């Protein structure tokens, strides 16, 4: 649905003004694993049709689940490289929740961009060696879940319950009153520290991730105009001092 919405924009916004990323490997289709070449092509062609474009800018391997013996790895990489050779994508990316998994495959995939899980509470970017690899190879880096599904913003006052199928239902921290109280306290501290910024809480949470990532960006889910306008005010990396201070709030 999101791709279809984006595909309606090209009469008003030039396609070349927008950098589009999509992914393959997010559903198995009729197969018993994530990276069957035929279904990767089905997903790729569906995305191009939805987006009303002949080529995306970036196409990710959505995760590093290539089979217990990595038996689907070669086909996955060969297929996405074929898409690139066919002019269906300009760049190739690799993503996973685990930076350790990314590190296990990064040299063999040889991606242009990495998309790891990272926020100021859950951060293995440096400790796994991913940061050093990204810098040594001048890769793009796009961090996902930067506000941990909203939990880090301090907007929750008590344990939350979610409907079946909502991913947040699997995040145990939403049931931790002590942690929720800490997030509320941290929210107040961010508002005080960055009072001169129009989005003080988001500035602290999001822009701290850019302090040590000069080739980086942060992926924020945006469901309404207000969230888009807030996101547009972010993206300036914190100073080392401010970044260390923010990280100390959530790791202390």
Language-model segments: which ranges?
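N-terminal binding-site loop/beta-alpha segment at the start of enzyme catalytic domains
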Residues: 1-18
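Short, acidic/polar
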Residues: 35-52, 97-104
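Active-site-proximal beta-strand/loop segments in catalytic clefts of secreted hydrolases
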Residues: 23-25, 146-147
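Beta/alpha (TIM)-barrel catalytic core signal, keyed to glycine-rich beta->alpha loops juxtaposed to Asp/Glu
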Residues: 9, 64-252
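Solvent-exposed, non-membrane alpha-helical residues enriched in polar/charged side chains
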Residues: 7, 11, 41, 45-48, ...
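Active-site groove signature of glycoside hydrolases
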Residues: 48-67
